[in-house]
């Protein structure tokens, strides 16, 4: 090499150049020399970095001077937009959209400005050098330092339309700082969440692909996959040469022009060859791929190609599965979790802006199909319906005419100019939609609410409301046609419920004039009593007494115990009642006032209650007790219950044992009665111990007496030779001594039908209303209820209940009457206190309130005096609502809605303009700001013309004709809001609204960036093969598209007409937009609407197309389509984030997801329907069936997500160590699975050497240790006690010369096709065992059978 000339190149070496340099050295000179070179480069770099001492100081941050003008231009544009919004030319959504796009554009422009400024003024600036050499930082960070920080998103992903205009060099304002922190926090949180997600993704990937190891040199397949450059629209994401590097050619590559072979089949493609192929202009190359490799359970060397780490063919035993998993998982952290839902996409990504190259005139050809279209900024433009061209005719310059320029516009483009328009150089002509499948702009429906900025009256202009009722009967009003909603200003008052207006439309009110009043009326009438108002607090309550009753027979005494007063009432016949309601409280109708103090119905213990003849009211609240309707007898069978809840070991007696009173039944618990013990326990916890008093009668013949269980024994009846003297209750028990009957005592309580307490009634004189204290008897327990208690309980309570006769209350919504309990001294004897019940209605007065934003001030006046007697319905007080400002009353609505409103049109709402010329407007017109009212006179604000007066006419002089006419135009201020068609209206024409009320919900479509779920979630969705949320519609068969339009121009369905005339209908759901124009031809499996494709559906469509070559070819074809789809989609996501991953890694993973099929019908094979089997395995079995003439297995290809695939691997050890351990292991145990220890995981878990890398040959290479002779092998086997429980480990495995010539005759070698080499180990050992050791025959047969089955399963 010495004689060659040294080449010197002068160029800047930045990060990219360095990369190329090292990779070139690596491919040409190998690892060692590259390492030395890299080391030298490092030293060089450090040396000069030290010399240069590059650092960033504040002075290095140079802000481009053009920033100011850029910002001013943006603000100007935004001001213009704001004016258009104020004038009602664009909707709120369009304004927001425009603001965001403007700022985005400015931010981008500023970024470019920063770069050029650095380049021109100071290319050695340290910031510039660092960012652009790739040493540290990138352009987006530099932009924040010296450009502008830009727009931030809030935590919901909505963009805040207030940009951060400053950069970190200038410093942020307080507002900007807070918004900035708001957005930055989101970034941090996202990153934290991301790492966990990405780690889990890597784990799943490793699990699904860990057993993919290079095991063969060449599988010999002729299939391959076509590779073409990956493009998005017109820009190439991955060049063909990049995609080809390191692959092996699958079919000869032919030069398109010279037709000579550039690369023969099975040639690995090196860097140079890849470039050569690309240079030759080959469109696509068929390469071998892991997806089409036919090696069983692995990938062969040729199908995998280069190991990218060494740039040479991959070695045998390389664990490519794990490498693939790590390659895909590692960049996961770099992917963004979610893209921001911007309200709309930044145009740069979806449309390409076409600007005119020169001044000239635009001509739109007649055949260019366009329709008018409103852009998302509310501008009018033309929407191109089919591909075509527009022509720019340049202006003549001197003598020669430059050639007209043709501009191609694709379907879906937007043209911003009209035919014949003059354009300047650099003017925006159109946005051309980029073709290509991936950029079908997905749109989603979103809503934005518009709130009113001022109070006033609603007036619709051009808005056509339309009502729809859905199935639930909710009606929504939408705008069928868009238009303006005007709010004409005025003061709106919310009237309280029940207020009556005292003014009419058109009345004039003064400031503090009365608008409305509410009256406070009494319902029941009676005597007015005003409680003594405490000083300084005006009276709020007015009480009206309607009836009262005094218990004149009873006296009240007070006993106080423990600081609480108990009031006892003693009646004439010395019955003592306890007052339940204390004096001074209100008692509602039906509430208990007092309770009889009575010991007759008290029991000593708990027990069991039965009713004999007693009837209670069915409907009654259990907590109040049940009212007795019919008297009778209560039968009480006492028993004492101890609730224990302790450990069973503390029990000192047995179940069924008879105990004396005072026995300790449980530690520290003694029983009070003698009787039989019943113990309830649960889980060795003692729940309760019941002692049932009574006598035990032993029984010899349980059958005879079992019928007496739970019966009553009447006095005089005989039982087991004893005559009963009193009523007993008989129960059958199993005591420790044997079966017995327990005869239990019964206590009887007589209950009278009517209580022996008089009821008191009183009738009010004025109103004829009656009030009474009714005595009732109440039982707290139901029939046959068990009362668990040790102490006694009350079985019957006699209570006095207040009942007010409510006559005719129902017509006016009566406040339920309450009675006040009061103690009054007896008129004759002052020492005796009597109980008085007073029924009163209390009315609360409104407080006077000062005016607030929505209500006028109120004033309340009282109309009655203390002690007046008033009739029902008379007015007690009235409240007046006063207006805040004078004006004219308008918009009083008829109707009785909950909130009634009225509007006062104030003087401040109107402006009057004088003009000498005749106005061009008339009263009632709605005008926007800037409208010309009369020649030379313009409106300053929007509103409605109220009046046009001619002031000059009043002159009565003769020369009236000559005098200048004076006109006065009065405008009522207003505010227009534009409404887009389809918006949901939340108000009606003529409504009155307060400031801040919602007017409409604007429904708009916002484009999703490529896909809202970018990044990790999208990759997870693809690899887990989830169905996307809004999947697109796929054409099941190819054909011509016909679009069916419903009412309006909404496409509602698509028809696809096949070549043979078959028509398939595809209805379009809401939010699905056409992707195919009318009349275009689609191949099968092509999306008809936009949205992500559902991979399962792709598989189904292509599989259902069928194929002449049988089901295997068909399944392979369908799977290949899905595989290509998945590989490309995953690549798309990584590419959009600027991450390069070699296709082969993704292919290895996708192969694992698509290698299974679901058996539909097993035919004559041993496979069961529903079983998941590898495609190649089924095919082998089917070939065997074809030879023997059996029925083949029918199957459908399935796509498994990585988790599913991991759980469905052949190796149960691997699956169990991944997820759902118990399920996997139990299934494996039930099915009697064997694990052939093929993958890495299984071997690691068991502790063997892993079959990859250096450990690969240990299990696979024949004739490793030839010095062991066959005889020794036998002796090794003889030493094992039971040949069937032999464990293979590394040391013993090596001792077997497994492929010695002597074994060939046993007939194993001819099964090679079905078996994998690994399997031979186990089988041949078994064969040795069979040949040379006497084995029990039956065991052997079983073993054989198992083995056969296993082969079927495994392979």
Curated annotation (Swiss-Prot):
Its cofactor is Zn(2+). Transmembrane segments: none annotated. Disulfide bonds: none annotated. Binds 1 Zn(2+) ion per subunit. It comes from the Bacteria. Signal peptide: none annotated. Gene3D superfamilies: 1.10.132.30, 1.10.150.390, 1.10.1790.20, 2.40.50.100, RNA polymerase Rpb1, domain 3. Residues 1331-1355 are annotated as: Disordered. GO terms for cellular component: DNA-directed RNA polymerase complex. It catalyses: RNA(n) + a ribonucleoside 5'-triphosphate = RNA(n+1) + diphosphate. One of its GO terms (biological process) is DNA-templated transcription. SUPFAM superfamilies: beta and beta-prime subunits of DNA dependent RNA-polymerase (SSF64484). Keywords: DNA-directed RNA polymerase, Metal-binding, Nucleotidyltransferase, Transcription, Transferase, Zinc. Its EC number is 2.7.7.6. Zn(2+) binds at residues 219, 293, 300, 303. GO terms for molecular function: DNA binding; DNA-directed RNA polymerase activity; zinc ion binding. InterPro entries: DNA-dir_RpoC2_beta_pp, DNA-dir_RpoC_beta_prime, RNA_pol_Rpb1_3, RNA_pol_Rpb1_3_sf, RNA_pol_Rpb1_4, RNA_pol_Rpb1_5, Rpb1_funnel_sf. DNA-dependent RNA polymerase catalyzes the transcription of DNA into RNA using the four ribonucleoside triphosphates as substrates. Belongs to the RNA polymerase beta' chain family. RpoC2 subfamily. NCBIfam families: PRK02597.1 (NF002724), rpoC2_cyan (TIGR02388). In cyanobacteria the RNAP catalytic core is composed of 2 alpha, 1 beta, 1 beta', 1 gamma and 1 omega subunit. When a sigma factor is associated with the core the holoenzyme is formed, which can initiate transcription. This is DNA-directed RNA polymerase subunit beta'. It comes from Trichormus variabilis (strain ATCC 29413 / PCC 7937).
């Amino acid at each position: 090499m010495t004689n060659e000339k040294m080449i010197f190149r002068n160029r800047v070496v930045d990060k990219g150049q360095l990369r190329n340099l090292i990779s070139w050295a690596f491919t040409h000179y190998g690892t060692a020399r590259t390492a030395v070179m890299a080391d030298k480069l490092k030293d060089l770099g450090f040396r000069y970095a030290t010399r240069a001492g590059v650092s960033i100081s504040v002075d290095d941050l140079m802000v481009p001077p053009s920033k100011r003008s850029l910002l001013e231009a943006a603000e100007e544009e935004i001001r213009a937009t704001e004016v258009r919004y104020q004038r009602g030319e664009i909707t709120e959504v369009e304004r927001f959209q425009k603001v965001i796009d403007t700022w985005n554009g400015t931010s981008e422009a500023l970024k470019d400005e920063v770069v050029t400024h650095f380049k021109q003024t100071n290319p050695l600036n340290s910031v510039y050098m660092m960012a652009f050499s790739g040493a540290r930082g990138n352009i987006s960070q530099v932009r924040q330092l010296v450009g502008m920080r830009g727009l931030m998103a809030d935590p919901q992903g909505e963009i805040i339309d207030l940009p951060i205009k400053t950069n970190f060099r200038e410093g942020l304002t307080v507002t900007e700082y807070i918004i900035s922190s708001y957005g930055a926090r989101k970034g941090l949180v996202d990153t934290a969440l991301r790492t966990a997600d990405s780690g889990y993704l890597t784990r799943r990937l490793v699990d699904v692909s860990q057993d993919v190891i290079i095991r063969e040199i060449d599988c010999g397949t002729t299939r391959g996959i076509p590779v073409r450059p990956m493009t998005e629209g017109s820009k190439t994401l991955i060049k063909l040469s990049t995609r080809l590097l390191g692959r092996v050619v699958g079919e000869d590559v032919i030069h398109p022009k010279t037709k000579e072979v550039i690369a023969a089949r099975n040639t690995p493609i090196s860097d140079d060859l890849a470039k050569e192929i690309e240079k030759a202009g080959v469109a696509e190359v068929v390469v071998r791929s892991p997806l089409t490799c036919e090696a069983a359970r692995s990938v062969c060397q040729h199908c995998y190609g280069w190991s990218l780490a060494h740039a040479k063919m991959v070695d045998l035993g390389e664990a490519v599965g794990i490498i693939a998993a790590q390659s895909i998982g590692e960049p996961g952290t770099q992917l963004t979790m979610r893209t921001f839902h911007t309200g709309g996409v930044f145009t740069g990504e979806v449309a390409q802006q076409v600007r005119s190259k020169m001044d000239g005139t635009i001509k739109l050809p007649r055949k260019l199909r366009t329709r008018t279209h409103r852009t998302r900024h509310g501008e009018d433009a033309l929407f191109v319906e089919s591909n075509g061209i527009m022509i720019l005719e340049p202006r003549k310059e001197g003598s020669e005419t430059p050639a007209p320029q043709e501009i191609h516009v694709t379907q879906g483009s937007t043209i911003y100019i009209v035919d014949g328009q003059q354009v300047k150089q650099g003017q925006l002509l159109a946005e051309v939609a980029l073709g290509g499948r991936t950029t079908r702009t997905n749109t989603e429906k979103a809503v934005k609410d518009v709130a009113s900025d001022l109070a006033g009256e609603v007036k619709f202009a051009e808005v056509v409301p339309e009502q729809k009722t859905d199935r639930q009967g909710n009606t929504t009003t939408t705008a069928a046609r868009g238009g303006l909603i005007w709010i004409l200003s005025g003061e709106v008052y919310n009237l309280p419920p029940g207020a009556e207006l005292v003014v009419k439309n058109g009345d004039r009110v003064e400031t503090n004039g009365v608008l409305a009043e509410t009256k406070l009326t009494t319902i029941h009438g009676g005597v007015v009593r005003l409680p003594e108002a405490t000083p300084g607090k005006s009276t709020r309550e007015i009480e009206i007494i309607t009836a009262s009753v005094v218990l004149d027979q009873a006296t009240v005494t007070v006993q106080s115990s423990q600081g609480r007063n108990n009031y006892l009432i003693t009646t004439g016949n010395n019955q003592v009642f306890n007052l339940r309601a204390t004096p001074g409280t209100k008692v509602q109708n039906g509430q208990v006032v007092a309770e009889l103090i009575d010991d007759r119905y008290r029991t000593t213990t708990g027990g069991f209650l039965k009713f004999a003849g007693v009837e209670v009211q069915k409907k009654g609240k259990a907590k109040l007790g049940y009212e007795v309707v019919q008297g009778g007898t209560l039968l009480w069978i006492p028993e004492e219950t101890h609730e224990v809840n302790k450990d069973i070991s503390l029990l000192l007696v047995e179940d069924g044992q008879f105990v004396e009173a005072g026995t300790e039944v449980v530690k520290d618990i003694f029983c009070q009665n003698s009787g039989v013990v019943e113990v309830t326990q649960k889980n060795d916890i003692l729940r309760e111990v019941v002692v049932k008093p009574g006598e035990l009668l032993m029984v010899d013949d349980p059958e005879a007496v079992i019928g007496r269980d739970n019966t009553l024994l009447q006095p005089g009846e005989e039982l087991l030779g004893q005559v009963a003297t009193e009523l007993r209750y008989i129960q059958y028990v199993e005591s420790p001594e044997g079966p017995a009957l327990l005869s239990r005592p019964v206590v009887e309580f007589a209950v009278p039908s009517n209580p022996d307490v008089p009821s008191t009634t009183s009738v009010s004189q004025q109103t004829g209303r009656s009030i009474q204290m009714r005595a009732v008897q109440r039982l707290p327990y139901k029939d046959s209820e068990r009362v668990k208690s040790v102490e006694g309980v009350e079985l019957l309570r006699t209570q006095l209940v207040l009942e007010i006769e409510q006559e005719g209350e129902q017509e006016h919504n009566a406040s339920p009457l309450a009675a006040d309990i009061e103690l009054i001294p007896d008129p004759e004897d002052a020492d005796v206190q009597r109980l008085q019940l007073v029924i009163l209605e209390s009315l609360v007065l409104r407080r006077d309130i000062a005016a607030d934003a929505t209500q006028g001030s109120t004033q309340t006046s009282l109309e009655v005096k203390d002690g007046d007697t008033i009739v029902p319905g008379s007015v007690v007080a009235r409240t007046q609502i006063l207006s805040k400002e004078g004006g004219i009353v308008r918009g009083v609505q008829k109707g009785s809605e909950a909130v009634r409103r009225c509007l006062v049109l104030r003087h401040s709402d109107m402006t009057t303009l004088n003009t000498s010329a005749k106005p061009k407007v008339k009263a009632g017109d709605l005008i926007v700001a800037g409208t010309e009212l009369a020649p030379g006179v313009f409106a300053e604000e929007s509103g409605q013309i109220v009046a046009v007066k001619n002031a000059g006419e009043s002159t009565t002089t003769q020369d009236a004709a000559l005098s200048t006419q004076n006109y006065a135009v009065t405008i009522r201020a207003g505010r227009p809001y534009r409404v887009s068609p389809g918006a949901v209206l939340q108000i009606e024409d003529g409504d009155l609204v307060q400031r801040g009320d919602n007017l409409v919900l604007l429904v708009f479509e916002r484009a999703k960036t490529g896909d809202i779920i970018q990044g990790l979630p999208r990759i997870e969705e693809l690899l887990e093969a989830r169905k996307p949320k809004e999947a697109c519609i796929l054409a099941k068969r190819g054909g011509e598209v016909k679009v069916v339009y419903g009412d309006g121009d909404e496409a509602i369905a698509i028809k696809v007409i096949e070549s043979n005339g078959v028509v398939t209908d595809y209805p379009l759901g809401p939010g699905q937009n056409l992707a195919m124009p009318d009349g275009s031809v689609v191949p099968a499996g092509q999306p008809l609407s936009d949205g992500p494709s559902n991979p399962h559906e792709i598989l189904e469509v292509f599989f259902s197309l069928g194929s002449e070559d049988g089901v295997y070819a068909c399944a392979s074809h369908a799977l290949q389509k899905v595989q290509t789809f998945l590989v490309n989609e995953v690549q798309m996501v990584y590419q959009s984030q600027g991450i390069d991953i070699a296709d082969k890694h993704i292919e290895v993973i996708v192969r694992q997801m698509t290698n299974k099929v679901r058996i539909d019908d097993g035919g004559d094979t041993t496979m069961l329907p529903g079983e998941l089997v590898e495609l190649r395995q089924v095919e082998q079995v089917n070939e065997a069936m074809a030879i023997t003439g059996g029925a083949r297995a029918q199957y459908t290809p399935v796509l498994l997500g990585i988790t599913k695939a991991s759980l469905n691997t052949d190796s149960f050890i691997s699956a169990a160590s991944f997820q759902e351990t118990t399920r996997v292991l139990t299934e494996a145990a039930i099915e009697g699975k064997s694990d052939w220890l093929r993958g890495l995981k299984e071997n690691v878990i068991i502790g063997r050497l892993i079959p990859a890398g250096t450990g690969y040959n240990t299990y696979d290479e024949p004739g490793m240790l030839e010095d062991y002779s066959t005889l020794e092998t036998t002796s090794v086997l003889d030493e094992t006690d039971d040949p069937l429980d032999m464990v293979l480990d590394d040391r013993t495995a090596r001792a077997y010369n497994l492929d010695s010539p002597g074994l060939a005759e046993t007939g194993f070698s001819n099964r090679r096709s079905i078996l994998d080499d690994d399997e031979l180990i186990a089988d041949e050992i078994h064969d040795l065992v069979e040949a040379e050791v006497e084995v029990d025959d039956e065991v052997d047969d079983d073993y054989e059978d198992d083995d056969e089955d296993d082969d079927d399963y495994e392979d």
